[in-house]
Design a protein with these regions (language model features):
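Short, conserved beta-strand element in jelly-roll/cupin
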Residues: 45-49, 64-82
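Short loop/turn motifs at secondary-structure junctions and domain boundaries
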Residues: 37, 58, 63-66
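A short, N-terminal "cap"/entry segment at the start of jelly-roll beta-barrel domains
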Residues: 1-50, 55, 129-144
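Short acidic-glycine-tyrosine-enriched beta hairpin
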Residues: 86-102
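Short beta-strand His + acidic residue motifs that chelate non-heme Fe in jelly-roll/DSBH
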Residues: 56, 82-83, 99, 105-111
């Protein structure tokens, strides 16, 4: 009988196609966190073109625009190499890579490019950066 009970509220579920999410950096990234209403961690979707070398070598140390944040990269399609201190790690669908906040990292897309989800969070309570809100100006890429 309980299964047939009518629900008076909508489920707390958000569904959005990646292509319908607000683009930043000329479409290289999509504001997935804000579009889905996530409040517990940072999350963007990146689509990098083949063999592109413009993804910044960066970290999320205490003086970064997203400080003290470790990141997990989840490839959706394509391949890339994540470079950290001269070591190379393959990003491909079916793998996930975690990178600590102080670790410099750069992602170099393979011959077909790559689309991946980047999830970030810090040990303390998460506070979304103002730049991640819909319509906000993204930060300048870090200088190398």
């Amino acid at each position: 009988k309980d299964l047939l009970r009518r629900r008076d509220t909508m489920p707390d579920v958000t569904v959005k196609a990646i292509e319908d999410m607000e683009p930043i950096y000329g479409g290289l990234a999509r504001r997935a966190r804000a579009e889905l209403g996530v409040s517990a961690w940072g999350m963007q979707v990146f689509t990098l073109p083949p063999e592109w070398d413009g993804y910044p070598n960066h970290n999320h140390s205490s003086d970064a625009f997203d400080p003290n944040q470790e990141e997990v990269y989840i490839p959706l399609s394509g391949t890339a190499t994540l470079v950290a201190d001269g070591s190379e790690f393959e990003l491909r669908p079916g793998t996930m890579i975690r990178v600590g906040p102080d670790q410099l990292r750069q992602i170099l897309p393979g011959p077909e490019g790559i689309r991946f989800v980047a999830i970030g969070g810090a040990p303390e309570a998460f506070t979304p950066g103002a730049w991640t809100e819909l319509g906000a100006d993204p930060p300048s890429p870090p200088a190398e």
